[in-house]
Amino acid sequence: MEAILSFAGIGINYKKLQSKLQHDFGRFLKALTITARALPGQPKHIAIRQETAFTLQGEYIYFPILLRKQFEMFNIVYTAHPVSLRTLPCVETEFPLFNYQQEMVDKIHKKLLPPYGRFYLHLNTGLGKTRIAISIIQKLLYPTLVIVPTKAIQIQWIDELTLLLPHLRVAAYNNAACKKKDITSKEYDVIVGIINTLRKKPEAFFEPFGLVVLDEAHELHSPENYKIFWKIQLSRILGLSATPLDRPDGMDKIIIHHLGQPQRTVSPTTTFSGYVREIEYQGHPDFVKPVCINEKVSAIATIDKLLQDPSRIQLVVNETKRLYSLHTAEPQKWGTNEPYGIIIFVEFRKLLEIFYQALSKEFKDVEIIVPEVALLCGGVSNTALSQAHSASIILLTYGYGRRGISFKHMTSIIMATPRRNNMEQILGRITRQGSDEKKVRIVVDIKDTLSPLSSQVYDRHRIYKKKGYPIFKCSASYQQPYSSNEVLIWDPYNESCLASTTTPPSPSK
């Protein structure tokens, strides 16, 4: 049997394959079907969602190239799809890499050498996945397509590529740019595009690229985004992710079919000291009751109810004031002009405006940046993001902030609403490689004691303990939205401790 080895994967004549397998053909296809696991409270249409590791195009059925070994029993003879790739200009440029980054670059480069290769890099948040990928681009010297989930990450890639490889022609591919001129691999060496725009392009657009980099590859599980895999089955694909196997519905297998199992590098030796300030907040009875939809507790609706409590909003403002006074006093004490940054995380967008208005009343002379609002509302996103790199206070939603946003001067987080998932990525916003490890990281975690969501704090404790952060507990209420009575409830150096009155460390060691 003959197959086509092409940019769309391994193509085998549908009728010939069906004839070869006969009555086993249906069972064979079913084995390559992935079904999402049903989760408590999950909508039925999501719980029964199915995706396949193959696609039909004309008379051929296409499989990911990584499944080639499964077809050796068919005595397949591959016919390579002819693709002529140009070579990028070779200019000797050097930029520093940490030892663990250089080791991973060497490993990836070897894996991606011709005729084809796949690599799925698993590297924790803030440890330099982008820089590793740029080093691979420099080594392979092929026209490269970088696919990202958001405009903010696109801008960061453009900035980093321009800084590290200034001799290459780099372009951002988005709707606005494409209306002005056609952006292709003939005119540019590296194109950085947002997946929402790129997935609409025909296969011919992708064919001239010698390398595709998928940033935040774990997010390609959705039915719409997953379709792009059939357009980018090129010779070399590099996937990047901080949480490659973290999907609770089990749909990670879709990406693994195309990229292979994630490969993790050795963790760097840089560590960031920090501590957690856990505030047990007793809210007003009118706002802490769970909100049920279809007889089940709705986390989103319950959080929305919690934030209708004006005292709880004031608590976040008070904690921001407390951190800000620490952050402005310490630089003055040590003779520097760089205040530490505070990120305030909320669950959804409408809360950004609520907290922005509340904070603006208290910080009249301080620039509070909400880059997400500018991006989502069609504002001057480049300006907003540029301002955010020097801002003292940034407001973000969890969903936006967990996606590779890089602000190296940020050292503190206030979790204004409860959170369970993606905590490692959230904490990664203040532990980025190359930032000042001498500054103590501070996490303010508000536990709504009377809410059914209060149990989520134990999932967060697991991540804090993994980081080695001591946990200090204090209390507040709707009658007094000022935290007090701070006691140590977990000490990484004395895990048997129950409570003490130990004082948290100063923001500067």
Curated annotation (Swiss-Prot):
InterPro entries: Helicase/UvrB_N, Helicase_ATP-bd, Helicase_Restrict-Modif_Enz, P-loop_NTPase
Induction: Expressed in the late phase of the viral replicative cycle.
Binding locations of ATP: 123-130
Domain Helicase ATP-binding: 110-262
UniProt catalytic activity: ATP + H2O = ADP + phosphate + H(+)
Coiled coil feature spans: none
Protein name: Putative ATP-dependent RNA helicase QP509L
